[in-house]
Amino acid sequence: MRVLLTSFAHRTHFQGLVPLAWALRTAGHDVRVAAQPALTDAVIGAGLTAVPVGSDHRLFDIVPEVAAQVHRYSFYLDFYHREQELHSWEFLLGMQEATSRWVYPVVNNDSFVAELVDFARDWRPDLVLWEPFTFAGAVAARACGAAHARLLWGSDLTGYFRGRFQAQRLRRPPEDRPDPLGTWLTEVAGRFGVEFGEDLAVGQWSVDQLPPSFRLDTGMETVVARTLPYNGASVVPDWLKKGSATRRICITGGFSGLGLAADADQFARTLAQLARFDGEIVVTGSGPDTSAVPDNIRLVDFVPMGVLLQNCAAIIHHGGAGTWATALHHGIPQISVAHEWDCMLRGQQTAELGAGIYLRPDEVDADSLASALTQVVEDPTYTENAVKLREEALSDPTPQEIVPRLEELTRRHAG
């Protein structure tokens, strides 16, 4: 069958789609990836066939006032301490309004939706798998008669909150049932003769790649697949080719955005605290310039995460799904300094399961970070629990093993 994967131009989101794309390809299906032009190199680098459509989004160019409105519903989604608030009608409606006004229309811009629909109508895929922010994929699928599903790369917050919102909305008086996402999708789909249905918001089904302990209960039809992290095309650097006996810690992801790395002096103090670790600390990504670092600190712009973590005792990161999944896959303890979207939730879940420590970015400092590192490295129960989570993840079917199920669902939903 013909399978079309689609994503707005966000490299790490796309990377979460790659293992299943290759599983479908090696099963003999014709697979193409339609995305905004900025993603083309990443698609080609994954060895997949790219179809550039539309114009690139400008999500990160939104003005601070608008960003603040979105952040009210995307920062510190604390399921452990804000549960009642997060499930209130006011919060659920506010989230639907903010994302449907300031996020989804920006990443699904008019030219992207139109050109994706045109391509789908011409190529006639049997199945469209869409990244969960890329609602254009659902519209294109309905416009050409294909089956379609969301391919989740992280925690299903969109499906979870959409389900809670709809349940409360339908209990309200008929004259007071606003639906910002439904209204926006109705307008977008209507341009192509497609009527709104809830499948445009959540897919006809979803593919969830998180292990059982981390899945959110959405009540929706879901196909479970093993998390199999892909970190992008890469080359192993010389320093990582050998020295497998070297004891390492990895620090990665948004480090420069933390208060403990606000400037070069603060960054240097943080590194000095962490350098007490007996081994090498590899710090990836950008941080403030510093003229000197301790001898056991290695600063690098990029490193193949899957290779590095094979020889790490622990990782400190910002909670991103790809980094988190790679650490989970290798069974190492995680220290998550996270606050955005689903990053906080996974960090808290990992900590609750005894495989790491969660730290709030607005509370962490050099001392607390160094203390957390010492704790997860010296207490073997963190590694033991991380290995248990790895084993749990490995119990899920591989992407290749779910292909027959996807074929069956495609036959059921097509047309």
From Swiss-Prot:
Its EC number is 2.4.1.328. It comes from the Bacteria. It catalyses: dTDP-beta-L-mycarose + erythronolide B = 3-O-alpha-L-mycarosylerythronolide B + dTDP + H(+). One of its GO terms (molecular function) is UDP-glycosyltransferase activity. InterPro entries: EryCIII-like_C (IPR010610), EryCIII-like_N (IPR048284), Glycosyl_450act (IPR030953), Glycosyltransferase_28 (IPR050426), UDP_glucos_trans (IPR002213). One of its GO terms (biological process) is antibiotic biosynthetic process. Keywords: Antibiotic biosynthesis, Glycosyltransferase, Transferase. It is an enzyme of class 2 (transferase). SUPFAM superfamilies: UDP-Glycosyltransferase/glycogen phosphorylase. Belongs to the glycosyltransferase 28 family. Involved in the biosynthesis of the macrolide antibiotic erythromycin. Catalyzes the reversible transfer of mycarosyl from dTDP-beta-L-mycarose to erythronolide B to yield 3-alpha-L-mycarosylerythronolide B. It can also use TDP-beta-L-cladinose. It does not require an auxiliary activator protein. This is Erythronolide mycarosyltransferase. It comes from Saccharopolyspora erythraea (Streptomyces erythraeus).
